[in-house]
Swiss-Prot record:
Encoded in a 14-gene locus called c-vac which produces cylindrical gas vesicles only in the stationary growth phase. Keywords: Gas vesicle, Plasmid. GO terms for cellular component: gas vesicle. This is Gas vesicle protein I2. Belongs to the gas vesicle GvpI family. It comes from Halobacterium salinarum (strain ATCC 700922 / JCM 11081 / NRC-1). The gene is gvpI2. Coiled coil: none annotated.
């Protein structure tokens, strides 16, 4: 490989890493925005369901949920909050960002408003 080819290859690799980081950051921003939008929708649905009076026609008397009622978005976030993804990717050359799931996603979404 000639010095010119090595230089071009190095520039291409840097460009690819920069594009990957920008794509990753854009995806994180979209994830946080979507989480906030879903939290607002949950709050609207909760308010609406609290104000509506159930009638015997619409309520299923045999319906029973075995899950505890979740009244806040933080409780919803904590319900399924585990990850099997390693914190640092094995063959990555760039620094890994903190994983966003569960309460970490909820806390990030609520502080970025």
């Amino acid at each position: 490989m000639t010095p010119t080819n090595r230089h071009t290859h190095g520039q291409n690799a840097q460009h690819a890493r920069r594009n990957a980081q920008q794509s990753r950051d854009a995806a994180r921003r979209k994830l946080i925005a979507q989480h906030a939008a879903l939290a607002e929708q949950r709050a609207r649905n909760r308010r609406r369901s609290d104000t509506e009076q159930p009638t015997s026609d619409t309520t299923n008397p045999a319906a029973h949920s075995t899950l505890p009622a979740q009244r806040t978005n933080a409780q919803n976030a904590a319900r399924n909050a585990h990850s099997t993804v390693p914190e640092q990717p094995t063959h990555a050359t760039t620094a890994a960002r903190a994983r966003l799931y569960g309460l970490r996603l909820h806390n990030t979404a609520t502080t970025d408003k």
